[in-house]
Amino acid sequence: MPLLPPSRQKDISNPLLKKIIVDVNNSRHNFIAFLWHALFLAFVTTFIDVNTVFSSLVLKIGGSSFHVGMLTGIAVGLPLVTQLLFAGFLAGRTRKKPFLLMGIYLRVLSLAGMGYTLAIAEKSDPSILMFTVFLWVGLFATSGAFAGISYTDILGKALPKSERRRFLISKQAIASVAMLSSALVVRHLVIALPYPKNYMVIFIIAAALLFIATGGFWAIREAPGKVSPLSRMLKVLKAIPHVLKNDKNLSNYILLINASSLGLTVIPFYIALSKARFGLSGHQIGNYLLLQFVGMALSTIIWKKIANRYKFKGISFCYALMGGLLPLLALVLSRTSIDFFQWIFFFSGFVISAGKISIEGILLEITTNDNRAIYAGISGTLSLTTAIFPLIAGMLIERYTFSTVFIFASPVIFSSIFFLKRIQCKP
């Protein structure tokens, strides 16, 4: 909706006022376009959830905790550690939208490929099937890194600072409702259809939904940005020590995400713990998925109230606190019954939503339009624990116990609160 009706707009002669009207109209247009993408991406997120859908698929194929760790390392860690490569390339481009769309279409291809692979799964050797699944996950994760940097940069340029917090909260609210409804669909598919047909249908639908989601980005009006002097990877690598030394916000942010991310990367191992203690049926997978997304939906209401008073740092504090408590609670509840243990996934929904809102929000507040792509690449590449922890955790669980990993993870996650307090977000 225009700020003023056409009859009034033609009477405006002040160039500054004209610019304000155009900027406000573009902001509203982009706000809606981003929400369109967020809505359909939320549907997709449920269908390809790493914590439940992917992890259970690996276990169904015949994998172990080690394979779950490898999967998590690829799906969560690979996009982060490859960001620097893409950040240098993208920093040399004034417009990021074409590269954002390319990254998303590669993700559509990988999901469709996953569906085809599972369509012929019964004729495939389990080892080859596992390897092929990991290849598709690798393509999905890498193209996600390419798209993710572009997304963050465009979001920073397309929405004024005054609109970003409202957008991120609105995005999570819409996403939570969408994910909750799609969780019911995925739960039904997992239970009603036999393996591997259920997973095949899930990934084909996910590919179609992600394709529809790109419509929002086609509609975005992207303003051209400046070309960063750090537009080549070698220059970026050489500049990292200087950037970290001169920007304490960035260095503390990197330490924050390294410590707090363990709260997210440990979640897939709750599925492995469930299989070890209670078995793993389609009914269980469906219930875990549903409880996780119910938690995400309900938590959005709480995060909105916290954001209004304490901003993104308040949400990040809750993210670290709950993320640190959950592994210990999982160990306790795993010694009871599945009726109690399944609520771990409900509370993991709180952790996931808090992480998505706060980590992205804090990055927006400590960066500018000129350095955002580079900072996203640096922080992602230096998120070493996100990539390495799942691999080490999987091996330790195979060799020792779940207690070894979970008890180690909790204090590390709690330590992120120290780095959070040292970050100065711009008002």
Question: Where are the regions a protein language model picked out?
Answer:
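Substrate-agnostic recognition of the 12-TM MFS/MFS-like secondary transporter fold
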Residues: A33-T52, L71-A91, P98, G103-V108, ...
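MFS-fold secondary transporters
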Residues: G113-T117, A121, F140, F217, ...
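Helix-loop junctions at membrane interfaces in 12-TM secondary transporters
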Residues: Y116-F134, V332-I344
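Helix-loop junctions on the cytosolic side of multi-pass membrane transporters
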Residues: T214-S231, K421-P427
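C-terminal transmembrane helical hairpin of 12-TM major facilitator-type secondary transporters
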Residues: G314-K356
